[in-house]
Swiss-Prot record:
Organism per entry: Homo sapiens (Human)
Molecular function in Gene Ontology: ubiquitin-protein transferase activity; zinc ion binding
Annotated effect of mutating residue 258 to A: Strong activity. No activity. No activity
Domain comment (free text): Ubiquitin ligase activity is mediated by two distinct domains, PHD-type zinc fingers 2 and 3. The use of these distinct domains may allow ubiquitination of different targets by each domain. The HECT domain is catalytically inactive and does not contribute to this activity.
GO biological process, one term: protein ubiquitination
InterPro entries xref list: EPHD (IPR034732), HECT_dom (IPR000569), Hect_E3_ubiquitin_ligase (IPR035983), PHD-type_Zinc_Finger (IPR051188), PHF7/G2E3_ePHD (IPR042013), PHF7/G2E3_PHD (IPR042012), Zinc_finger_PHD-type_CS (IPR019786), Znf_FYVE_PHD (IPR011011)
Location within or outside the cell: Nucleus, Nucleolus; Cytoplasm
Keyword Zinc among UniProt keywords: yes
Catalytic reactions of this protein: S-ubiquitinyl-[E2 ubiquitin-conjugating enzyme]-L-cysteine + [acceptor protein]-L-lysine = [E2 ubiquitin-conjugating enzyme]-L-cysteine + N(6)-ubiquitinyl-[acceptor protein]-L-lysine
Xref: PANTHER family: G2_M PHASE-SPECIFIC E3 UBIQUITIN-PROTEIN LIGASE (PTHR12420:SF37), PHD FINGER PROTEIN (PTHR12420)
Protein name: G2/M phase-specific E3 ubiquitin-protein ligase
Role noted for this protein: E3 ubiquitin-protein ligase which accepts ubiquitin from an E2 ubiquitin-conjugating enzyme in the form of a thioester and then directly transfers the ubiquitin to targeted substrates. Essential in early embryonic development to prevent apoptotic death.
Zinc finger extent (C2HC pre-PHD-type): 11-51
Pfam families in the record: HECT (PF00632), zf-HC5HC2H (PF13771)
Amino acid sequence: MNESKPGDSQNLACVFCRKHDDCPNKYGEKKTKEKWNLTVHYYCLLMSSGIWQRGKEEEGVYGFLIEDIRKEVNRASKLKCCVCKKNGASIGCVAPRCKRSYHFPCGLQRECIFQFTGNFASFCWDHRPVQIITSNNYRESLPCTICLEFIEPIPSYNILRSPCCKNAWFHRDCLQVQAINAGVFFFRCTICNNSDIFQKEMLRMGIHIPEKDASWELEENAYQELLQHYERCDVRRCRCKEGRDYNAPDSKWEIKRCQCCGSSGTHLACSSLRSWEQNWECLECRGIIYNSGEFQKAKKHVLPNSNNVGITDCLLEESSPKLPRQSPGSQSKDLLRQGSKFRRNVSTLLIELGFQIKKKTKRLYINKANIWNSALDAFRNRNFNPSYAIEVAYVIENDNFGSEHPGSKQEFLSLLMQHLENSSLFEGSLSKNLSLNSQALKENLYYEAGKMLAISLVHGGPSPGFFSKTLFNCLVYGPENTQPILDDVSDFDVAQIIIRINTATTVADLKSIINECYNYLELIGCLRLITTLSDKYMLVKDILGYHVIQRVHTPFESFKQGLKTLGVLEKIQAYPEAFCSILCHKPESLSAKILSELFTVHTLPDVKALGFWNSYLQAVEDGKSTTTMEDILIFATGCSSIPPAGFKPTPSIECLHVDFPVGNKCNNCLAIPITNTYKEFQENMDFTIRNTLRLEKEESSHYIGH
């Protein structure tokens, strides 16, 4: 019995479903017997209603004799599929008096259930088994315990509930992939590890559990890294000056692992744990058990400086380096996720995207006086990879000595975003839309702009905050589902035409205005027959649609492609509410309280100097200083606002015996002077910060002039 090579079988159709697809997870193994010119999908053969396995496993195809297969194909050729209306429907619903027949792929399409056990029964969409819950106390979405995507806890074909754990819900696709990988020996409830009850219910609901060993058991040294204890602090603000990986047993800097997953950790001091015996759960596990009531009973360890925030905000931690596998149908469930109580925080989403960043570093040579062109050259370099960690070195153009000095990545990204906001690629005052710049289009700058925005967000840069709601909605919902408004029109002449048309009070006035603007309306294809005054509204809608959306269609598509870098656009479309806050709105104004909590003390503090520091922040907020909160943050970090993904490393304060403050933007460190009086402290701080920022601006202007 010669079997064709796998590559050859792809061109042959299954004798039952007539499909060429070779997809083992969906249709089972595709096998071809050259001797009898026969190709079948395993599931198509197994689920056919008129055939039985009369031979041994090695006989025929999986124990199904060739003559029996021929008879079944002949029987099915007389039956019409009730889905695709073609002959060859070999599978029938087993419900009494139900005469529906269908192909296996068609049955999957119509959400039929195939039971891979017993008599291998098949049920159509009207008679398929369902899961029944006596009462539904789930008012909020719950996560699938495999992929962690949020789902509505209502049993359906695509959503299944564990029979042994009331809070365990799954996507059907997630369960099927899990079953194929785990096999009959390891497929069990992800919460309680029950095997018997769980497998019986899943078989009843049409999950195929193959009789084989788990895939990881067949792989040498699989999951070897799990044999190592996890030792890293993942809380949002680690207070250990030795770093997140530091672990000192029997001290406050000992790493405590999550009691649920063991794949996330915290220093005892960073989560206010008094002893190692205290329980602690990571953010992901705490969110899963919240609705079960266990979360409310557990002792809450709130992160420092987290007053007046919601329950999910106060528990925001830096995600551990484990990425949940996305289910195949996850994108279609985004709307369900948006209605969830656990709306994702944008900083957490960006931190997740940041897991793509590798340890390998790429150094960018940036000329601060020509930030755009030097950034463009760096990002277009064939050796540049967006997933590499970025290191910045500042250089001076036409410097014969070739000198360079270390630069702040966040300062560079902040300057780049400022330039982008004021560039000719966008138009508008505060809320901006894409402009139509033929030269920029020719040079592919819209793509580069989108790419820069994506890189900035993932690598810890500032939030743009200048998108109009129209541009944002086009990115999320598509231009065809977005209606521009008058504020989106930055061209004064076009805006005046729209205003005149919209304020016309009679049909005669409206026709007169259209005659005056005839050439323009004809050029943009918006001429229409006017019969009533209400026709002006459709005309205005057409003009707005052309000027704001259709006119810039090509730049928009290019910009959109750039935003796909590192998966940013997909995240924006999945969590529009979260990203709207940073793309369409400027960050909140800084205050003395925010800066005081932002900077942590990493060295032995001088109590007097720290008191002066807090008094100075309050004086700046009250307008009693020549500097601003933004000036202080720029001086220390290079950024005028807190990036959505947070600072790395966390901004810190040092008290040194120096006369003037020193800002280290590469390390986000501010050294404050130790002085005898507060007056001297404020004068030295004001003088240094004000003049340092002024000199930096003058240097940039000087280089630009040359």
